Amino acid sequence: MNSNPKKKFLKLIKIKSDIILLIPIFLFLVCCKSGDFSLLSSPINREKNGTEIVKFSIHPYKGTVIRLGEEILPFKVLEMDKNIALVEMAIPVYKDEKEIELKLSSPGFQNSSYRIRKPEELNEKLIALDKEGITHRFISRFKTGFQPKSVRFIDNTRLAIPLLEDEGMDVLDINSGQTVRLSPPEKYKKKLGFVETISIPEHNELWVSQMQANAVHVFDLKTLAYKATVDLTGKWSKILLYDPIRDLVYCSNWISEDISVIDRKTKLEIRKTDKIGLPRGLLLSKDGKELYIAQFSASNQESGGGRLGIYSMDKEKLIDTIGPPGNKRHIVSGNTENKIYVSDMCCSKIEVYDLKEKKVQKSIPVFDKPNTIALSPDGKYLYVSCRGPNHPTEGYLKKGLVLGKVYVIDTTTDTVKEFWEAGNQPTGLDVSPDNRYLVISDFLDHQIRVYRRDGF
């Protein structure tokens, strides 16, 4: 009854004033806690401390605009490689040394941003914009040894990368960027020519083929230490396949046109098949009774005529070839029973086979020279690396006139979902076991590209 309305009113005003004063402090703390310094590092009111020149690559560079706040940062093209350019750009340096955000835009591509604390972080980087409508996001580029022929995840973040024109294979962690070079003994590594790998986790082994030494090498999957070498009588060893039913490893031999059979325990070649055409990719049937062989051609004397070979494991001979002639390169299982996918390099297509009917169900057109294919662990997508046309006069070991492409095929409908441009001759390709990442190797750029899959 003795309350004073005037005092209450003044007290209420004071409380509201205190709240209003606390709002900026609250926002400041939220920004600091979340790591989002965009409200704190706007270039508008920041004091500059000169500029720093950086050099990095942009894909694509034509039509691309780079902004810092409202300011457009011009760049100078130093080198061009089709749609990719090495550029030079002056970036403002601020006294507060807080993070800055570069925003990139280009017609036909999704807007992108790149955050750095120091300008030198951009040096030697690749910024690749994602095409409009694409659901895969470019994350990073890592340099490798010369000519990364294939890639294989050995866990969720580490890759085994055999090098065709180098002395072994790189094992690279896509989170840290740390690389370890694995090489066999001196007499082997100097011959170069490392091609493909298999990982056998149940026996803690990582195998790699070396075609120019006619050999296969075994490393410890955990420690990466060298363990053994298997010398082969087959010539130019390529694809490796582990048979868990018989505890054997198969290796396709390009020049001798046969397949070496290796005892995994003894690390010895125990036999070879007869000539079976020019073998490339290999796949074992689920019951282990048949071995499917991607014939690049019918023989070394022919430029075409390769089909899908069916080899009987009991009879130890080729019992059938199916499908149209071409240059079959790689085979993977489909997401349903009796379904497999085969890449055909000469015909720019992926063939879908019904193994029960022993025929091609469908052909899916893709870009030139499709080679490695990989089914995502979740079974949703088949990924295809397409090298693109060879150089018109100097073959595939010289950069061609256009860049290669990566295709994504929806396995429910077996239709192309999306595709985008990669580097010079994308060749190796794999998806991480946890479904998060797609990695490809740009064979003639000596690098890999890492993409984040949608939803992961």
UniProtKB/Swiss-Prot annotation:
Q: Which Pfam families match?
A: Lactonase
Keywords attached to this Swiss-Prot or TrEMBL record, sorted alphabetically, are: Cell outer membrane, Disulfide bond, Lipoprotein, Membrane, Signal
Question: What InterPro entries does the record tag this protein with?
Answer: Host-pathogen_enzymatic-act (IPR051200), Lactonase_7-beta_prop (IPR019405), N2O_reductase_N (IPR011045), WD40/YVTN_repeat-like_dom_sf (IPR015943)
Q: Which GO terms describe its cellular component?
A: cell outer membrane
Disulfide cysteine pairs (residue numbers):
C346-C347
Q: What does this protein do?
A: May be involved in virulence. Binds human plasminogen (PLG) and stimulates its proteolytic cleavage to enzymatically active plasmin in the presence of an urokinase-type PLG activator in vitro. Activated plasmin has proteolytic activity which may help the bacteria to spread throughout the host by degrading extracellular matrix components, facilitating tissue penetration and invasion.
Q: What is the protein name given in its UniProt record? A: Antigen Lp49
* Organism in which the protein naturally occurs: Leptospira interrogans serogroup Icterohaemorrhagiae serovar copenhageni (strain Fiocruz L1-130)
